[in-house]
Structures are given as C-alpha cells and as structure tokens.
Amino acid sequence: LVGSEMCIRDSLSAIRARHRRGEVPSRPVRFILFADEEGSGDLGSTWMGQNHPEVFDGVTEAISEVGGFSLPTPSGKRAYVVQSAEKGLWWFRMKTTGLAGHGSMHNPNNAVTRLAAAVNRIASHQWPDLRHPVQEEFLARAAELWNLTIDRDNVERSLAPLGPLALMAGSGCTNMVTPTVLDAGYKANVIPSRATAELDARFIPGHEDEMIATIKELAGEGIEFETISTNPSVEAPWRGPAVDAITRALQAEDDGAVVLPFLNPAGTDGKGFGELPNGRHIDCYGCTPLRLPEGFEFLSLFHGVDERVPLDALQFGARVVDRVLGES
C-alpha cells in the first residue's frame, strides 16, 4: 500500500469524516481519480488535461502522491519531505539493422554489437550536476538538519544517514538514462538482422532538449529513435496557500515537525496539470502524509513484493489531510 493507493485512502477518509461532521470547506475541493499513472498518464491525467480541461476550471493547487513521509533527525524531531518538482520523462526505443548470418562467421555489420555499444555509451555517460533550486534547498536544509557536508560529486554518499532517500535525492541532481529492455535474435548461432533497446530517460526541469541531443550524439550513426512516451517536468513554487496548509497540518499533528521540499526523480499524475490547453497550469505538490517508526524502510518497499505501512501511519495521514481540507 504505497503511493497513489494511500493518497486515495487518506483523501476518502478525510472527506468521509468531514461529511459526517457536516463540515464544508471554505472553497470547492475536487477529488479526482485518474487511471494509467503507472503507465505514462497518457490515458489518465494527461488525457484529461488535454481533452477535458474544463474539469479543472477554478483549480489552482493539487495534492498528489510521493512525499509527506517522515524521516528521523538527530535532534529527535521528524522531517517531512514534500514534492514540489519532478523530472520529466522520455521513454524511447533505439533500433538498428545489420547483416544477418551465422554466428560462427566474422560479421562487421552486426546489429547486436552496434546497438550494445550505443546502449553502453549512453548508460555509462557521466551527466553533469544540474542542481534545480528545489533540490538546492532540500540539500541545504538536509545538511543543516543532519549536520552533513554535501559532496557535489557524490550526493548519495553524503546523504547516507537519510537511508533510501539518499538514492532518490542523488537521482534528482542530474539527468539520467537507464536501459530497461533489450530485444534481438532468436537462436544462439544466428546473427539477427535487427536489434532494439528501450530506455528510460529522466530530465531535470528545463534540460529536456540538451539531454535528448546528448543521447543522440552518444548513440552514434546507424541508430534509429522512436518515442514511446514523453511527459513534461513539473515545478511548483515552495510558497503559497497549499504549502502553508500542508506545513501547518503536519506540525499540528507532529509538534516540531520540519517540512522541506524535494525534487522527485520519478513521476506522478502532476505531469498532467503542467500545460493545460488554455494556457493555465496547476501547482501540484506530492504529500501523502505518513509518520513512520524509526528504522522503517519505507522507500525500499516501493513496488516491492510486500508493500506495507503501519496502520497508525495511515491514521496519521488521514488526520493531516483532514486538517489541510479544513484550510481550503
């Protein structure tokens, strides 16, 4: 029970509680469920945003998944990270052709070796540090809270006291490309005439074009590109009514809580709100509140075989969401 499922559960619990108490928010609140978030959003939030933007008329802020979970600090207080930016994505396929033949014969026009070399160049490329302002603030606050010195060349190692969040934070400091699917051939002694690879590219807001240009340069000649899916990056200001409401709600339920922003290296339904057809956009924040026991490896359970969170963490989340709705 991680991510969107918890967001739905917290929201429904808070809405039900307010309905039973006869309490109405000071302004309209829309509870919208989308399909396809784990795919690409092309048939979910993105489709709705492009085809039915009227659904979002009057909406200025949105709260979705990824964020709001607690981390212990040396002072004894808990820190809660809230997503206020996320990387964009480009899922793409690389294809190449060559000369088919027998595996026992030298073949200088081997599609598999050409593709493998291209994939290796892209996967091993050292992407430059592109620290987004949101990530800069997160790292500065983290260094203060955990008494750390941040090594810009190895952010993940610097943030080791934060556990699995260190990997997430480090991945949010650069563009990244990860090979995920390889397909070629059908028999060990037959050189195939074609080979394909699928890769997952994630870019820091504002750096999409340079990332794609670098990928194509690294691939070299003889490689054809095909886009599988693309989504924009997302940014929301770390200020305003939504941020204030989230902060006050967390601190009301956890005295002394520290709330800080972070850039999500993955994606959420927030990508569907960034570029609405009428020129509007909706500031989207990731906050599924969870007060977790110290030592609970929450992030390592994402998409695992035993996704779970403590019941009292869910109850805490429902109370926080209820308070946020009360300030709406």
Regions found by a protein language model. Name each.
Residues 70-71, 128-189, 193, 205-213, ...:
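An extended, acidic, His-containing surface patch that forms the Zn2+-binding/catalytic region
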Residues 1-8:
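Short, small-residue-biased leader/transition segments that mark boundaries at the very start
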Residues 50-68:
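A glycine-rich helix N-cap at a beta->alpha junction
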Residues 66-68, 78-93, 290-303:
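Flexible glycine/proline-rich, aromatic-decorated loop/lid segments
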Residues 32-41, 65-70, 100, 291:
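Acidic, glycine-rich active-site loops and adjacent beta-strand->loop/helix elements
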Residues 46-48, 99, 103-128:
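A short core secondary-structure module
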Residues 26, 57-58, 77, 85-91, ...:
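Short, solvent-exposed loop/turn segments at the edges of secondary structure
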Residues 15-40:
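Short helix-loop-beta-strand segments that form the rim/entrance of peptidase-like active sites
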